[in-house]
Structure formats: C-alpha cells, structure tokens
Amino acid sequence: VKPTDNLVMIDDSIVRGTTLRQSIIRILDRLDPKKIVIVSSAPQIRYPDCYGIDMSKIGNFIAFNATVALLKDSKQEHILTEAYNKCKAQENLPKEEMTNCVKDIYKPFSTDEISKKISDLLTPEGTNAEVEIIYQSISDLHASCPNHQGDWYFTGDYPTPGGNKVVNKAFINYIEGKNERAY
C-alpha cells in the first residue's frame, strides 16, 4: 500500500464497532494508506433484535451512540427525554397498543450524518489515515434481498407488537442506566 492509496475493507455488519476501533483500524493504518474506507454490507443497526440474535442492549450499538452524541453536539438532548417519556407512558400498555418511540431520536439526522459521527467515534486517537465508514442503504438492502423483509434492527419496523415493547424497554433501560436485557 502506498501513502497515496485508499484502502477499502468490507464488513458484513457493524454492531458495536469495538473490533474496528480496538484493532482493525489500527492494523490497517499501519499500512500507511491515505484513506481507510470501511463498507458495511448491512445498514446501520439502530434497534434491538428480539427474534434470535442477542442484540438486546441499545446502548451497545454504535449507530445509537453516534446519534446520542449528535443530539448532544447539537444541543437537542431534549429529544432523548421526550422519547424516554413516551416509552414510559406506554410501558404498561398492552404490547399491541405500543409504538416504537425510539425512532424519534434518529429523525433530526440523515444516515450520512450518523455515518460520519460513527466514523469519528470509531477512529482511534493517533490514526494517520482518514477513516470513512459507509453503510448499505435500506432501499438497496431491499433491492438485493427482495423476498426477505427482515429489516427491523435497521428500520425499527418490527413484525410483531412485542418488538415495540422490547425497543422501548431497551431505551428505558439505557436512560435509567440499567445494563440488562430488555427481554
């Protein structure tokens, strides 16, 4: 790799970003590229999964953490409080009456803005190369897998009412500082 080269790496998905931050980006940076581009074949994972994959703690997701950071940077933390209050108001409703209140926190920002913040958060201090993380879009995911619409951890559109209950509980746990599963 020459110092004028861009280095592209493909990842199947980026959930927490820990491995990227703690090792992969550092290893790639030692090759001295001008830029490191990490392409995720999955969209940003924003919501917990409650149908088989153990991704129940929303505070572990880098897309969520990037969005929280953007809300703080733009002095819009009130959106977190409003979403929390909506979740709490629905907490004892039958799950069929619940809605995904966590979607509200993502509304102020574009996918590109969140991706840029993820890149910033996952770039280790002392990295020489520019780091850019690019995610698959939801529309392109649907085009590539037209017969499989299992996209709830990207969109928050759960296929059952229990999904809304889980996402709201995961957010309540996050705001209340409870490091426990939402189900």
Where are these regions (language model features)?
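PRPP-associated nucleotide enzymes
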Residues: 1-183
